[in-house]
Amino acid sequence: MFHRTTVLRAVLVIITTVVIGGCGQSPITPVRLENAIEPTFANLVELQMSWLGLPPMAASDFGVTASCRKLTGGKTGAGEWACNVAWLGPSGRTLRDGYDLFVTTDGCYTATIEGNNLGGPILKAADGRDVRNLLFTFEGCFDTT
């Protein structure tokens, strides 16, 4: 009986060590996600301006900043996130938009606007054409290594 209990304890210690060792800090963090969303969003705004026939602006002129938080299950890792994006519109006024994100374990995400702040999935260009709203839903990936 003593030998069996000792073996069982040893097995439990090994299993616990393996499980804990495999559960290191996730590479998916708020900072990494924010650093991925900011340039992606800025580049999409720059392209959107062109599609709408508005005066061109460089992506860096939009001064995009993001603030992200995981909605469930801790502060890091794959799953559902929310990000607030602040950026300078063409008039120089600060605009704020909220996005719901789903982030996968490989660092890829899909961002969908909360509400219709940015005009819905289709916008009217200056010449009357319908154009896809690139800011309504967008995807991106970041390095998790």
Locate predicted features:
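Sec-dependent bacterial lipoprotein signal peptides
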Residues: M1-G21
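Short, aromatic- and cysteine-enriched interfacial helices/patches
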Residues: M1-R4, I28, L52
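A broad structural signal for short, well-ordered beta-strand segments within beta-sheet-rich domains
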Residues: V7-A10, L33, A59-V64
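Bacterial signal peptide processing site
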Residues: C23-S26
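Post-signal peptide N-terminal segment of mature Sec-exported envelope proteins
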Residues: R32-M49
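Post-signal-peptide N-terminal segment of Sec-exported extracytoplasmic proteins
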Residues: L44-K75
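Extracytosolic low-complexity repeat regions of secreted or lipid-anchored proteins
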Residues: G77-T145
